[in-house]
């Protein structure tokens, strides 16, 4: 990247995208200061530490290790310089609510045999699907993800046109794409559930994201010792080595253009006057609440018409004893999950028969719980904007704990020694998340690639955005790349 010596840049928000952008900009020579609303850095990748338990409050899956390796390699580093990784086996366990159970492992020959047991011919279809997924992953990452193509003109390129057949082939939905390979509903669920973590439904997520199966089965699922919070610590440490300064408990309430540079003011009345600003706060919140009306790119109708990724009902729990047979990552899936997706995306309601996720990091890491105890959280995807008052939370808590006992055999109810709930209103309060989304903008057909909000402001020179609302999208790896894209855009404009 070009030399930014003498440029003063303020990054508003210390999520993964902001931490990433700060590193790239500081490496290019800019004086970078980062302001974070909350008491710790990491954004949704916050940590909760209490009574000897340590919880990752947000992301808990370490996927796409190649993205992290690429990020650190840019600075002459490796992930292991900052944290240690363990590859999980099994990757995760699935309990189906009809009593069936399957472990998803890193042995694809074994998985092909398991698929064959469910459906004749599915083993061969699984191998073909993964081969296709790998090709699409390599093409998508090299042509569409690592390269920022946020403008229509960026797609009129020989390399892109050469890769276009992949995009055309995958212009349908994940549901129709997976159904072309597998008829058994359980196999379809296995290949589609990770879409929830991209903020979408199989019925609306582009088939492009079949590449996530390559991520899942081929690249593997890892755990950073200490949790995803250790990755945040690594990004912050790298930033400090590059000269980034960080300030927490510094919520920004105004960003406005001045004749020379910007005014950035916090709720405490502290001001900075940078040359450029990178916003990692919730994009819609920043436009609606932090910028003057004449410096906004989009009106309220634009944001009101967007499809936001699910929120979540979370319970962080410290419990006595172990929680066998739960694995580090466990999914519990109903026989028919369409009603749950309807409750998220079509007719918002608390799901009556939910699909949900359990994370038990103490299965892998003794440091996250006191001796003789287990650390776990349960995550139920729910509609953004849903009312989540105390009464409905308590009622739903009882439903979920009973469901866990019925479908996994693990009854937690008499063993909980610590519990904290987190849901829609908490996402809104802690992260200024629009409609309490847990993730950002959903990856729908109308909100993918250049159809996502741009990382350059079209209304104000010198103002940029990074994170899960812009390209390339949702997830820790994508936000790392988003930080790179945003830094490149700023540098291109200054050079």
From Swiss-Prot:
**Quick check: keyword Ligase in the entry?**
no
**What PANTHER family does the database record attribute to this sequence?**
PHYTOENE DESATURASE (PTHR43734:SF1)
GO process terms (BP): carotenoid biosynthetic process
Looking up InterPro entries in the UniProt record yields: Amino_oxidase, Carotenoid/retinoid_OxRdtase, FAD/NAD-bd_sf
Q: What is its EC number?
A: 1.3.99.37
Protein's name according to its UniProt entry: Carotenoid 3,4-desaturase
Q: Part of which pathway?
A: Carotenoid biosynthesis
Q: Which family does it belong to?
A: Belongs to the carotenoid/retinoid oxidoreductase family.
- Provide the reaction this enzyme catalyses: dihydroisopentenyldehydrorhodopin + A = isopentenyldehydrorhodopin + AH2; dihydrobisanhydrobacterioruberin + A = bisanhydrobacterioruberin + AH2
- Give the disruption phenotype, in one or two sentences: Cells lacking this gene accumulate DH-IDR and DH-BABR.
GO MF entries? oxidoreductase activity, acting on the CH-CH group of donors
Q: Which domain of life is it from?
A: Archaea
Q: Could you tell me the gene encoding this protein? A: crtD
């Amino acid at each position: 990247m070009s030399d930014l010596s003498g440029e003063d840049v303020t990054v508003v928000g210390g999520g993964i995208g902001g931490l990433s952008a700060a590193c790239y900009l500081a490496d290019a020579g800019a004086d970078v200061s980062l302001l974070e609303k909350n008491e710790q850095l990491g954004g949704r990748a916050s940590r909760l530490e209490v009574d000897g338990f340590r919880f990752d409050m947000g992301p808990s899956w370490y996927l796409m290790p190649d993205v992290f390796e690429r990020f650190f390699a840019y600075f002459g580093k490796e992930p292991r310089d900052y944290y240690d990784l363990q590859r999980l086996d099994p990757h995760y366990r699935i309990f189906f609510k009809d009593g069936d159970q399957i472990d998803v492992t890193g042995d694809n020959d074994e998985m092909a045999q398991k698929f064959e047991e469910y459906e004749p011919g599915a083993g061969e279809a699984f191998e073909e699907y993964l081969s296709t997924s790998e090709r699409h992953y390599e093409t998508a990452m090299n042509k569409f993800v690592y390269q920022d193509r946020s403008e229509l003109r960026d797609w009129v390129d020989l390399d892109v046109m050469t890769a276009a057949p992949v995009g055309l082939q995958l212009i349908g939905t994940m549901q129709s794409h997976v159904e072309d390979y597998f008829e058994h509903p359980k196999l379809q669920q296995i290949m589609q559930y990770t879409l929830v973590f991209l903020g979408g439904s199989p019925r609306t997520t582009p088939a492009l994201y079949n590449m996530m199966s390559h991520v899942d089965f081929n690249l593997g699922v890892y755990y950073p010792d200490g949790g995803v919070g250790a990755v945040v610590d690594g990004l912050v440490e790298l930033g400090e080595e590059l000269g980034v300064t960080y300030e927490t408990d510094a919520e920004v309430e105004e960003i406005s253009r001045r004749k020379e540079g910007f005014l950035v003011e916090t709720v405490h009345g502290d001001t900075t006057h940078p040359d450029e600003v990178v916003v990692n706060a919730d994009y819609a919140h920043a436009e609606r609440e932090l910028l003057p009306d004449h410096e906004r790119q989009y009106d309220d109708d634009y944001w009101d018409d967007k499809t936001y990724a699910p929120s979540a009902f979370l319970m962080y729990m410290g419990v006595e004893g172990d929680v066998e047979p739960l694995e580090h990552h466990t999914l519990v899936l109903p026989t028919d999950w369409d009603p749950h997706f309807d409750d998220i995306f079509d007719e918002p309601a608390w799901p009556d028969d939910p699909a949900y996720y359990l994370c038990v990091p103490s299965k892998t890491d003794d440091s996250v719980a006191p001796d003789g105890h287990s650390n776990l959280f349960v995550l139920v995807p729910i509609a953004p904007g849903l009312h989540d008052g105390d009464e409905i939370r308590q009622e739903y808590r009882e439903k979920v704990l009973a469901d866990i006992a019925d479908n996994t055999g693990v009854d937690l109810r008499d063993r909980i020694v610590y519990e904290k709930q987190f849901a829609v209103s908490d996402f809104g309060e802690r992260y200024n998340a629009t409609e309490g989304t847990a993730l950002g903008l959903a990856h729908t057909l109308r909100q993918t690639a250049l159809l996502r909000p741009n990382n350059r402001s079209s209304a104000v020179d010198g103002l940029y955005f990074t994170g899960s609302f812009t390209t390339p999208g949702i997830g820790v790896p994508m936000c790392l790349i988003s930080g790179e894209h945003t830094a490149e855009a700023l540098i291109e404009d200054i050079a």
